[in-house]
């Protein structure tokens, strides 16, 4: 038997739970087919979520899943230019014609879908982002020049969470696009996802006790994002997320972290998301999304 | 004597690649180990860490390089930073405040250092006074700032503990920066 999991037509953090629910009990016992034929658009968060599912199935020693590529030539070309198919080919048996990826991605892809497995990869990511980030953040989003370096720092810290906590590799992608309905402004989105142990298991040995019966995916996210705790006893740890929150507050940005069955967000005034969502469909590892909006005239 | 350590050079040795970004904890730890090894082979008491050819310093690396270096060498060396840009300041200041540590940093084209990190307000004022006036004893600081002797002594003691002044006899010397 094959379990068919449909990729939402418009696949981003909001439709992610529909995708996660498709897997049922994790890991699914049947062969998996991820069906993206009807997909019209996917955010970087959506693209790396598909890869994370493929990686998690491989690590659970399940049969190699199938992936049917989008029917739309435009969508396929975009995914190819974002580097998605290069990575997906290792994890999925691809079905459907895949366009060859161009030499360079579209101008609003700041960072192709990039694997992060070791700290050397973080160096590569930060090095690669530095040129395009200034053009988008300062040129398009009207952020001050020093924002570019803060942005790179945030990206570095987010990627290091994979290396230090996941216990396996992950993915990162960065893209600029327009939030028409939610905000009506350009945004830059950093998406980071891994198929690792997740926040609850990572923090359990050091912090579960003081939460008592409350301990779970939601409490673990709260400990990490709100209380800035780390699984390491080193007192210098846990500052990365604290710093990211500080500068996102200044730019009215948003961070949300989903791990296991919970999602916690620091919600800016322009968004209507709920801060904490619990009892969500399980999905392996952790998924982080950071959104930085273009600055309005008054806040320049 | 001052020993100048070019951070860009150490970074390239540590990662074996031409990157100019001080990022990740393993990289920071590798760079710090090289700084410690370098200092162990010199007779100098002051290490001037030159960040001029560093593009980005992230928090993890600032913690591994600067905070842990200060924690490790607290009894042995004076550490001064130079060639920092504003965003470097921000990362280093953030991690040092977290640890309640402080370091002197020399701005570009200046010999007058500023403090990054955490010290009590009196110690910060005393640091500025010693850096500007040159060597002072407790009485001299009291006179310059209009403080009681006890208040001045406390501020200078704190700077001494943080290795932000060099006590010699009754005098407290500013850290050498050139």
Language-model regions, residue ranges each:
Chain B
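Short amphipathic alpha-helical interaction segments
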Residues: 146-161
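Short acidic, hydrophobic short linear motifs in intrinsically disordered regions
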Residues: 132-145
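Domain-start "cap" segments at the beginnings of catalytic or binding domains
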Residues: 1-24
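Short, cationic-aromatic polyanion-contact patches
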Residues: 119-120, 167-178
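Amphipathic alpha-helical interaction surfaces in cytosolic regulatory modules
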Residues: 19-46, 51-101
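Short helix-capping/hinge SLiMs at alpha-helix to coil transitions
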Residues: 40-41, 130-134
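Short alpha-helical segments that sit at the start of domains
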Residues: 98-129, 154
